[in-house]
């Protein structure tokens, strides 16, 4: 009986490995078709399988490690792309789930030892929340605020912290024509800045040298900058050639960006999910 069990188990593993290999081949083929190196990246911190789930939404950095958000999780990864320094796989507090229907973490931002996370009741859009986590442990600090849903009318897909000006930025999650500004300490609404042009499907942002760098999931998953004072929008580059829209997000999905000057000369670090949602890519770009 044991010999038969081992034969069956071995056959199952071989079939399973073959299926995974086939799916990865398909995923890489589709990725190659869409990721046409419109603007070349220098390197790619890539993961497959289950790790994709925990690196599927947002990214930020403190200059010493990467912080990723999944749909309901936070994880801190060393720059070697392998060593897990901290994790919180149930990052959405139970009280948020019970009281507000919270189900989704978006594009995150690091500031002064804390991770600021946007949390929403996905597809309901009634309770957009800013929640604060300890960057060392990724544990929830207890600090949070429900933002006004007459301003944040379609949930909260991203936020970016601006330490210098004491602000948090966000926008409409599908068609951003305005930049919403909140106080970094109290989370109270401060002002709205009109944008010079619409940014489609913003997924995350980071403030660097006075500009907000935005990662989008528009037709080319473009990266933009926004001047938070004037509202001027500038496209930096396209990440793919064109997204075929017969099937939504066919070919993968553009996600968050973080900005930090690395020793290899890269500055913009842009997250995307590959075709078939089997791989997560953090692509590192040089930018002047």
Q: PLM features: residue spans?
A:
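Beta-propeller domains
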Residues: 66-92
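Structural motif
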Residues: 73-78, 124-132, 176-181, 220-227, ...
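Short loop/turn segments immediately following the C-termini of beta-strands
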Residues: 71, 120-122, 171-175, 217-219, ...
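Short coil/turn segments that connect the beta-strands within blades of beta-propeller domains
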Residues: 63-64, 112-113, 164-166, 209-211, ...
